[in-house]
């Protein structure tokens, strides 16, 4: 494998006076499944725990996640959602039945964390709830009742039941998932089978009072565009002015790993070849987003329906001596770079892509946080999210290359070594820059045209080794720091990025 590096790893233009689509803050969403130690131990410790908590919810985790201004949180799954019956998780905790988590570790849980606890968590986080309904093993009536229980405010049967359980006012629910991975753990259904079920569940997931649900129809794995087309055919016909109002988004899932599905590679022990295989896989998300978008464009040219990537992130082999069903993995600088190139892809596809959820928030897959008893650490991925918060609800600014960027050959495929995106809001511009080359710095130049800019403030997340990661003994081994040497001369931003680094530069727009 070889690297082709021009004098400038990136030489690009950004027209500040030609903003593009808004980057929905919901592209920075998160995911909490009843899986391993995500909900139990990660979020929920119970009111009797010595770990500081509010109503059983860990205080340190809430405070850390509030730093990210997380816009939405998906729950209770995942595969778990299609075995979850919501009535098991309401009412007095002592009366809730125990259930077996058949998908994840075959462990027994006591339903201590249910609907009321999840909604309390969302209130503490200041985030929008994204609830996944049970299509795989549940009934249409269950879906209808759960939505009524959550969102109806009058004297209806489910509203009365909610009040019996201690909650007078209805909650606001932003997103409701119609199933999860129905082609696999959600029922092993064909696309046409699921489409019929989804139409029923979506019909009875009603809007009550002033609450307006965004219904997300469970979609494809990776680049299964035929699945997306089947779902689009259910709500629109070619040439129709508007899609039918059954669901407002169609989802897909895409995970990044270095090896095969059966042997994905280790989180912190990997070769350079495995590193570059990871980056090639991560960058492929652009092709897949574009493919699903093209299918949707044929049926919905005005982009009234959104595309959702409601599971994404790195998936490695579990850490040694941990339950293989708990999906616990460390989180290295490499993971943060996978996140940053996804963000750039999201920004560039903001017209159609409206929602994304990284898997998962605590102790599972590409986590923001890891916990061990009362201890908690932030991962490099947490820092990548924090550095990118300025893109939430900003207007995207396309980054146009003037010359071809540097590339690295991965088994005959040229993989770009630099990724970039930009946005503007509130009188400022935020430029994101990623150097994927783990062995060489990258000089980048971005010509910011159309508006005057000043006062660059640059932050970088980098490490000497892309396998570097934070531990409970060294929680700040990988942490953001100021990036020196960034200049703006006659509107041209110049910066040198360290190897394997993610940087953001905030600039002030002239009034």
Regions found by a protein language model. Give the residues of each.
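Non-catalytic accessory regions flanking glycosidase/transglycosidase catalytic cores in CAZymes
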Residues: 1-249, 282-286, 290-318, 322-511
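Anion-binding catalytic surfaces of enzymes that hydrolyze or transfer phosphate/sulfate esters
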Residues: 245-247, 251-261
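Active-site His/acidic residue clusters
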Residues: 256-276, 322
């Amino acid at each position: 494998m070889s690297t082709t590096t021009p004098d400038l790893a990136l030489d690009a233009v950004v027209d500040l006076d030609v903003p593009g689509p808004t980057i929905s803050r919901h592209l920075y969403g998160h995911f909490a499944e009843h899986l391993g130690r995500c909900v139990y131990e990660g979020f929920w410790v119970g009111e009797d725990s010595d770990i500081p908590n509010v109503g059983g919810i860990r205080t340190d985790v809430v405070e850390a996640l509030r730093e990210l201004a997380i816009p939405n949180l998906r729950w209770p799954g995942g595969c778990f959602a299609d075995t979850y019956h919501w009535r098991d998780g309401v009412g007095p905790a002592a009366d809730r039945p125990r259930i077996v988590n058949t998908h994840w570790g075959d462990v027994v849980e006591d339903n201590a964390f249910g609907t009321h606890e999840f909604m309390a968590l969302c209130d503490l986080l200041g985030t929008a709830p994204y609830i996944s309904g049970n299509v795989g093993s549940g009934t249409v009536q269950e879906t209808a009742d759960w939505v009524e229980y959550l969102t109806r405010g009058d004297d209806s049967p489910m509203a009365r039941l909610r009040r019996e359980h201690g909650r007078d006012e209805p909650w606001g629910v932003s997103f409701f998932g119609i199933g999860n991975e129905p082609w696999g753990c959600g029922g092993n259904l064909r696309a046409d089978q699921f489409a019929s079920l989804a139409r029923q569940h979506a019909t009875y997931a009603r809007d009550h009072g002033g609450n307006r649900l965004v219904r997300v129809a469970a979609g494809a794995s990776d680049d299964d565009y035929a699945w997306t087309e089947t779902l689009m055919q259910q709500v629109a016909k070619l040439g129709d002015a508007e899609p039918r109002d059954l669901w407002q988004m169609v989802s897909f899932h895409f995970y990044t790993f270095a090896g095969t599905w059966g042997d994905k590679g280790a989180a912190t022990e990997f070769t350079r070849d495995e590193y570059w295989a990871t980056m090639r896989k991560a960058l492929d998300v652009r092709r897949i987003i574009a493919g699903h978008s093209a299918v949707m464009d044929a049926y919905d040219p005005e982009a009234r329906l959104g595309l959702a990537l409601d599971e994404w992130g790195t998936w490695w082999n579990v850490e040694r001596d941990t339950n293989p069903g708990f999906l616990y993995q460390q989180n290295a600088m490499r993971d943060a770079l996978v996140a940053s190139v996804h963000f750039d892809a999201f920004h560039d596809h903001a017209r159609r892509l409206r929602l994304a959820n990284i898997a998962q928030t605590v102790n599972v897959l590409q986590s923001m946080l890891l916990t061990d008893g009362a201890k908690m650490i932030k991962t490099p991925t947490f820092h990548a999210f924090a550095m990118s918060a300025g893109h939430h609800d900003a207007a995207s600014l396309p980054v146009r290359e003037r010359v071809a960027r540097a590339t690295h050959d991965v088994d005959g495929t040229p993989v770009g070594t630099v990724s970039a995106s930009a946005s503007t809001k509130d009188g400022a511009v935020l430029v994101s820059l990623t150097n994927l080359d783990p062995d060489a710095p990258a000089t980048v130049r971005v010509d910011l045209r159309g508006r005057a800019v000043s006062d660059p403030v640059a932050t970088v997340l980098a490490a000497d080794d892309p396998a570097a990661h934070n531990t409970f003994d060294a929680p700040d081994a990988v942490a953001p720091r100021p990036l020196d040497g960034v200049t703006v001369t006659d509107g041209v931003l110049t910066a040198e990025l360290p190897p394997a680094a993610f940087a953001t530069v905030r600039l002030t727009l002239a009034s």
